[in-house]
UniProtKB/Swiss-Prot annotation:
This is Transient receptor potential cation channel subfamily V member 1. The lineage of its organism: Eukaryota, Metazoa, Chordata, Craniata, Vertebrata. It is found in: Postsynaptic cell membrane; Cell projection, Dendritic spine membrane; Cell membrane. InterPro entries: Ankyrin_rpt, Ankyrin_rpt-contain_sf, Ion_trans_dom, TRPV, TrpV1-4. Changing residue 800 to A: Largely reduces direct activation of by PMA and PMA-induced currents; no effect on receptor kinase-induced currents. Changing residue 646 to N: Strongly reduces the affinity for pore blocker ruthenium red and lowered channel permeability for Mg(2+). The chain crosses the membrane at residues 433-453, 472-497, 511-531, 536-556, 572-599, 658-686. Residues 767-801 are annotated as: Interaction with calmodulin. It holds the Pfam family Ion_trans. The keyword Iron does not apply.
Amino acid sequence: MEQRASLDSEESESPPQENSCLDPPDRDPNCKPPPVKPHIFTTRSRTRLFGKGDSEEASPLDCPYEEGGLASCPIITVSSVLTIQRPGDGPASVRPSSQDSVSAGEKPPRLYDRRSIFDAVAQSNCQELESLLPFLQRSKKRLTDSEFKDPETGKTCLLKAMLNLHNGQNDTIALLLDVARKTDSLKQFVNASYTDSYYKGQTALHIAIERRNMTLVTLLVENGADVQAAANGDFFKKTKGRPGFYFGELPLSLAACTNQLAIVKFLLQNSWQPADISARDSVGNTVLHALVEVADNTVDNTKFVTSMYNEILILGAKLHPTLKLEEITNRKGLTPLALAASSGKIGVLAYILQREIHEPECRHLSRKFTEWAYGPVHSSLYDLSCIDTCEKNSVLEVIAYSSSETPNRHDMLLVEPLNRLLQDKWDRFVKRIFYFNFFVYCLYMIIFTAAAYYRPVEGLPPYKLKNTVGDYFRVTGEILSVSGGVYFFFRGIQYFLQRRPSLKSLFVDSYSEILFFVQSLFMLVSVVLYFSQRKEYVASMVFSLAMGWTNMLYYTRGFQQMGIYAVMIEKMILRDLCRFMFVYLVFLFGFSTAVVTLIEDGKNNSLPMESTPHKCRGSACKPGNSYNSLYSTCLELFKFTIGMGDLEFTENYDFKAVFIILLLAYVILTYILLLNMLIALMGETVNKIAQESKNIWKLQRAITILDTEKSFLKCMRKAFRSGKLLQVGFTPDGKDDYRWCFRVDEVNWTTWNTNVGIINEDPGNCEGVKRTLSFSLRSGRVSGRNWKNFALVPLLRDASTRDRHATQQEEVQLKHYTGSLKPEDAEVFKDSMVPGEK
């Protein structure tokens, strides 16, 4: 019998090459030969690229080019010629096999290996696979056996066929599914996935969805494909600096993130295995979280993401009326709304905050309710759930305390209702508390300055208290100063424990807190030195005093013009000045070491050599005008930086030309080059900040507002909470739908004629509306020349609202709710829908 073996490559399109060798005639043709040892020139197995410590290449999903690999399992075929040795005969006689084993005209059975199957499915050649089922049944094998899978990636012939579609189809897919069904391995075969670390978990259903093929998706689901299979390989994870596509791992999320609404509806509504709309991936993200993750703030992307988000939300409400899909959090404790805020997806954030659904059965999904409209002016109620600071991981906290690298951080605070909510908090209580704190801090610094100025100077500390009025005032001032230092110290500790800023964002986002904390440290060190009878306490005290007056700039954020100026100073110190100082110190140290090497004390070129009584170098030589030390030379070179240097500050050197060249080079690099670069960089920083100065100032004020709220007790936070508890309709189970809402009056001259509606009679005839409108009128926002710049208009409009072409009725009369509400202070807001109509 002839034994054939071929080098296997899963991607090759050429027929296998065979090498024959003699085999004993009595050997079973179906027996499995021993494994072939790998060739010494075969390539190593590929593993993932981006794992820790990995350096190998990442393999593609499918490639038509051949790559060296291990030898495949040998192919066993029936030879057409047999060599038989009989007793008594002479030399071995050769005769045709048809005389003993195979009848004339009968074809030998077709045998398959991984390579032959892969080649057939890649070419969509069903004829090559006609004998596959008899072969598997005869050999008692299945397509899910390891010998029919890629040893490196775990790819099966079904996955190979899904990756090689011709005009959107591959005829071998149905054939392979039928073969797997008849070999009792259909479910395992359909759900077989990649096993390598890069594409781990990807199944045929994922590929069919990615190929946007509804027919194949239906075929796979009908045959038992797992609609909850998770593709969690490295390629499907979101890691900074790594190429890949994160879509939420699940097939439903993949269909949603690739904008395939038909497949989304099929996965949720099919009768074979409906997908779980609330399923979460390995990081706890649902399909809504995944949609937020794939948003990139471009117009087209935002439009498709918000549209898909809206469709899934409505579909989920119809399939599972009591499920609160938007309230599901991931492992970081973030809802889709909070995730949009933390990642800077301003378009998605604006859509969610301003979503208004008019369908009666889905109106409970709205976060915005239009209360009344009159011309271009309309009053809206915004749901404050997940927005206000009363809840954990609220949108306001996420935006205000996010990293400075978060995109659109400043602009997100201008989206309604965030902009008006912060303004309401500032006007109602934060402004008064902030100004009071400013007054107290000024008083504290005055007392601290007086206590430091009138400190005793005779003797060693601690000083005895004299029975004089001045000493009593001094000691009282010292006690108050130390108490303030202790307060700022523990406040800084509390801040760092709560926020836990990273080292990268520590100096950028926590600039003011660090300065107050350092001020308190200097004060506490001064106290320790004072009671240790060390007069050095004065040095630490004056540093604390200087930083205390500098930190008064923190309170300029309560005033727009001064707040912007303080922001510019902070940015220039952190960005421009730090970089300048690093380069300048390198130049200063380098040229100082060069100059001090040339200087020799006692060496004077203008005097004879006999007049130099001695030569010395280093710290041991201390004449009156010695420059033979690094410290004194650095001071002299620093004078050159500010234009006060003298090229002949010493003559104790040899090689005068070299000395002058060093000084001139230093002056050119520092005084002419570096200082002018610093001025240019500062000018650029000022221009950048000036363009968005108001937004930056609003962010600083927002942080101040939230810090003030956090300083309250829980009972006080509820008392100062913005908005009111209102009834906005009914829940899906027929109960009253109470929301904590905040009223915002808006003006829109663009679409006002398509949104004319009067929800309440006598628009504006309520206390809250009067208060809001009167505030706007007092601010001059609606009067005369400022009407077009009415500040009630949100910066970002809901994409679904812009695309809605259906006009509404000009006047909508809604029924009044006459029943009693459980919350006594709740205002009633209902639409025309009654519970029986739902």
